[in-house]
Amino acid sequence: MANSTSTQILVEGPRNVVVKFEGVLDTSDLSSTTVLDPTTLSAIDNAPGTLPSRLRIDKIIHNVEDTLSLNLFWDATTPVRIEEITGRGKQEYKDIGGLKNNAGTWSGGTFTPAAGFTGKITATTQGWAASGVLSFSVTLYCVKQV
C-alpha cells in the first residue's frame, strides 16, 4: 500500500471555508501536499466577483498519532511555516485576528507577496518510522481573503 491523503471541504460560503485533511502514512513521511488552494474556491462576499487569493486560519482541530507531527505552511518559493501540530487538541486564533498568510511583507496596509506566493496551505509530516502505520486528521476553519 502507499501513503494516502484526502481533503474534504465541509463548509464553503461567501466568507468562510472549513476543510478536513486526513492522511494514513505507511510508506514514508508526507512530502509537501496541498491542503487548501484559495483560487479553487468561490467568490468572496465583501468583494463580489473576486476570487480569494489568500486565507486566514481562525481555528485548528487536530488528531495526530503519537510520534508524528504535521507541519502546515503558507506556500511560496520558500514556504513559511504556520504551525507544527502534534497530539490531539484545538487551537483558536480568532481572538488575535487569526493566523494570516505572512509569506510576504506588509507595508502601509498593503501586502506584497513573496516570490512564488500561491496562497495555498500545504502540509508535510515528520516522525514516520519504517514498518509503521501512522495517521492524522486536521480540520481548518478559514476565512477567504483577497
Model-assigned labels for residue ranges:
Residues 1-14, 125-146:
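C-terminal interaction-tip segments
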Residues 19, 57, 70-72, 82, ...:
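Hydrophobic beta-strand residues in large extracellular and virion-surface proteins
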Residues 103-135:
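Noncatalytic modules at the cell exterior or secretory-pathway interfaces
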